[in-house]
């Protein structure tokens, strides 16, 4: 069990003394850390150690590696901790070493240049002097030295921060400081996932207290039932941006409240609710305490959505009514949803939510029923849905791939019940990964040698990356083989430790790891590393174990399968998948051919995505929102073999990997799983293996290298975080900033007007209906005009409150009706019966059989999206 018996509220001090085991070593060992004095010539090492720029600036990071490579690994690649542990003699030696001093000065130059030189603006109407984007997320994965992340959401948030920094975007991030972070994982001899925790000492983390201009540490507070919880604010420097982290583990609080920010995704539903109050409400207050006034607020997944209520409360305190406040707040808010799985959306039961949020009702000037309405949804069953709150409290919403955008539009269609799902306001921005973080050093060095340093400034130019094909196959293959060998060596060290701890004999260890010795003949290495959730179907390969065994045991075409990943401690089916793979790996026919690696983390992930040959992804369609691990693999020339879901639905081009079309139709999940498993094995047997082992006289397969180059060439300029953040800036941030300013100016005149208009429209809309004013002709000649008159029973609304539109549709080859044109009708006054009159005079642009549909919907110039009210009437 993964309990919430958090040890975070102990004093932040050195580890406890340990009792020596065994009669031959008597007494107690008391920890004592003797910290070195950093020589004056290296004084700024301390500054470099607390700027997470080191997480993506390789020369800065390598400076610490070269200081003491062994200690670097022992300290978990944590520069701040390393500087406390490094030997005085080594520091003194480095201070006299001309080569080290040269690298030190280079690192300082890179650091200072990064912070002082601004790149040419591509921010598209965002003014760094007046605009600020505040990005809220429950987790951030910037580097393993700050473990406040669990997986894809956190890594994506970290990459977003890094790209925002690289682009000099006016940007600040807000999260929670988890002392325990996410759980650590070991796998025992029976394949059981063993959950552990590793509380971090604050002194080890790259964080500093956030202070005001006079140097006083910043504190804010939030109200919980019967008490006030104090929060300390920590600041993380990540290049040009700051990340503010809230911490409840301070002496002013009770033990229970100190544990609120202890563990990421730990504890029960009440703990989760407390965390989200701290993140959303406390996060807004933290930014105010820091003197920051964001103009755009980005809610990354539903966890921080309570910030909407806090910002509304601020405006209500300034004299606005709640509806007006909500319009202004929503106008400046962007919401990104990340999961198509219902279980991924936080829902709090009515009693719990009411108990914790009742004090905010009075502050907002509404009753509890109105507040609950903001979080209502079909799946909440009377509870409060944080995704629903985020959707209703924002005006710009998106999924994280084209397919996921469509899925999210369907899932969240209840917000706009009368709007066809394909037209509702949910869009998409496909995720991207931070190239400087995940591109292997060997590839960076090769690009520097072949292309010069300019390639770093060409990350969004597709034509530039055509030059990948100019790299000789021999050079290209040599880099990949070097990365593969390093990956296999790292994996071998990990699994040998794992096996020895589990009591595996040395003879069996040798047999289990014999394929981790690369040679010219192979093996082909297939990697599967991600969260072990059931919808990701880690066991898809094992539907036909006899056929799989035949593939893996061909001596002429050796194959190695590497699996890694964690299952949430409460996800028992996910843990069963881990056991399943472990059991298969110990069968005689799979011995040494399937390896399950424990302790999946960022370091292992970087090794795998740069070193395997094939990246396998087998989600149940359409439940893979994005799948950024495949993007990380592709930019390193690793070939994807994946279900066409998430990003791969856009990334697959036929020449850059393999895609499995989801098997749809009237089949159950079990049948679909069997069919897709068979197709996966077909592709491996008939395409992947023959191509990879087509070595001919070169010692490597030229056709394989062509696919690998295409994978890199196509992924690099499209699926990177720089493109992603620029897209958010163009399509979301600048619109939110402009819209919020428009509604807030002149003492919120626009917000008041829009709120009043929406109330009037909502009251009148049930009585709105359309009827014909003339007969619709059944045929026309090309060049003739179609004349229509539509009469609208407007129920008190005026002609400028409505848009009336005619849709021209025709069928495609599948029989689906496709909208070919949308034409607005012109207002023509009021008839004798008080009906609004609208006219159409339109010449169809194409001949052939078509159908027409006419609809009306509310219109106001201040709407962010024409369908945001969710109202529509059809003829």
Can you say where each PLM-predicted feature lies in the sequence?
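Catalytic cores of carbohydrate-active enzymes across secretory and cytosolic contexts
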Residues: 2-875
């Amino acid at each position: 069990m993964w309990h919430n018996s958090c040890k975070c509220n102990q004093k932040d001090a050195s580890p406890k003394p340990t009792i020596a085991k065994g009669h031959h070593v008597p007494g107690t060992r008391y920890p004592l850390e003797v910290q070195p004095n950093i020589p004056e010539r290296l004084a700024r090492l301390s500054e470099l150690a607390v700027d997470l720029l080191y997480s993506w600036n390789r020369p800065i990071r390598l400076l610490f590696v070269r200081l003491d490579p062994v200690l670097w690994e022992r300290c978990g690649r944590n520069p701040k901790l390393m500087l406390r542990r490094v030997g005085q003699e080594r520091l003194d030696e480095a201070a006299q070493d001309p080569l080290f001093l040269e690298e030190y000065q280079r690192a300082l130059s890179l650091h200072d240049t990064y912070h002082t030189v601004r790149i040419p603006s591509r921010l598209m109407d965002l003014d760094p002097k007046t605009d600020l984007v505040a990005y809220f997320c429950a987790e951030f994965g910037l580097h393993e030295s700050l473990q406040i992340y669990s997986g894809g959401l956190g890594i994506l948030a970290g990459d977003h921060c890094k790209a925002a920094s690289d682009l000099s975007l006016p940007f600040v991030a807000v999260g929670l400081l988890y002392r325990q972070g996410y759980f650590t994982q070991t796998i025992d001899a029976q394949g059981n996932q063993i959950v552990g925790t590793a509380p971090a000492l604050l002194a080890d983390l790259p964080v500093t207290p956030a202070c005001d201009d006079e140097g006083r540490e910043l504190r804010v507070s939030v109200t919980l039932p019967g008490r006030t919880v104090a929060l300390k604010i920590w600041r993380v420097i990540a290049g040009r941006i700051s990340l503010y982290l809230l911490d409840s583990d301070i002496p002013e609080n009770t033990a229970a409240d100190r544990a609120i920010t202890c563990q990421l995704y730990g504890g029960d539903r009440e703990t989760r609710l407390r965390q989200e109050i701290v993140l959303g409400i406390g996060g807004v207050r933290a930014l105010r305490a820091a003197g920051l006034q964001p103009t755009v607020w980005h809610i990354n997944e539903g966890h921080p959505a309570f910030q909407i209520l806090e910002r509304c409360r601020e405006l209500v305190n300034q004299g606005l009514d709640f509806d007006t406040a909500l319009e202004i707040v929503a106008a400046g808010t962007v919401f990104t949803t990340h999961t198509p799985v219902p279980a991924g959306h936080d829902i709090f039961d009515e009693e719990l939510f009411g108990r914790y949020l009742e004090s905010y009702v009075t502050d907002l000037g509404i009753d509890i029923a109105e507040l609950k309405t903001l979080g209502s949804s079909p799946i909440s069953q009377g509870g409060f849905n944080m995704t629903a709150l985020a959707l209703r409290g924002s005006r710009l919403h998106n999924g994280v791939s084209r397919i996921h955008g469509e899925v999210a539009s369907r899932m969240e269609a209840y917000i706009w019940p009368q709007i066809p799902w394909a037209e509702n306001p949910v869009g998409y921005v496909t995720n991207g990964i931070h190239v400087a973080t995940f591109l292997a050093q060997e590839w960076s060095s090769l690009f520097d040698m072949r292309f010069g340093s300019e390639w770093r400034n060409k990350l969004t130019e597709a034509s530039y990356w055509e030059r990948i094909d100019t790299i000789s196959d021999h050079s290209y293959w040599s880099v990949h083989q070097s990365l593969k060998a390093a990956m296999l060596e790292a994996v071998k060290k990990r699994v040998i430790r794992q096996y020895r701890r589990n009591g595996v004999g040395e003879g069996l260890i040798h047999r289990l790891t014999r394929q981790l010795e690369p040679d010219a003949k192979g093996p082909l290495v297939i990697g599967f590393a991600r969260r072990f959730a059931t919808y990701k179907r880690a066991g898809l390969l094992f539907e036909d174990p006899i056929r799989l065994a035949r593939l893996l045991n061909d001596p002429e075409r050796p194959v190695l399968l590497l699996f890694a990943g964690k299952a949430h401690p409460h996800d028992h089916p996910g843990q069963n998948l881990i056991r399943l793979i472990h059991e298969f790996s110990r069968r005689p026919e799979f011995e040494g051919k399937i390896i399950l690696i424990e302790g999946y983390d960022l370091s292992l992930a970087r090794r795998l995505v740069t070193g395997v040959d094939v990246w396998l992804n087998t989600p149940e369609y359409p439940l893979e929102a994005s799948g950024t691990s495949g993007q990380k693999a592709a930019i390193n020339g690793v070939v994807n073999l994946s279900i066409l879901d998430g990003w791969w639905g856009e990334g697959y081009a036929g020449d850059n990997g393999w895609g499995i079309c989801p098997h749809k139709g009237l089949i159950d999940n079990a049948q679909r799983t069997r069919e897709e498993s068979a197709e996966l094995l077909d592709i491996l047997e008939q395409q992947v293996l023959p191509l990879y082992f087509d070595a001919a006289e070169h010692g490597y397969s030229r056709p394989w290298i062509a696919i690998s180059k295409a994978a890199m060439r196509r992924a690099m300029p499209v699926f990177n975080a720089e493109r992603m953040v620029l897209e958010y800036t163009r399509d979301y941030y600048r619109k939110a900033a402009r819209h919020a300013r428009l509604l807030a100016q002149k003492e919120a005149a626009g917000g008041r007007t829009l709120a009043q208009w929406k109330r009037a429209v909502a009251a009148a809309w049930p009585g709105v209906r359309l009827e014909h004013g003339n007969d619709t002709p059944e045929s026309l000649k090309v060049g003739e005009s179609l004349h229509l008159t539509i009469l609208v029973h407007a129920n008190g609304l005026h002609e400028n409150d409505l848009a009336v539109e005619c849709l021209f549709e025709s069928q495609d080859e599948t029989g689906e009706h496709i909208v070919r044109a949308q034409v607005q009708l012109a207002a023509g006054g009021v008839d004798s019966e008080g009906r609004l009159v609208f006219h159409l005079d339109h010449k169809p642009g194409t001949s052939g059989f078509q159908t027409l549909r006419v609809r009306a919907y509310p219109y106001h110039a201040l709407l962010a999206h024409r369908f945001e009210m969710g109202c529509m009437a059809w003829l």
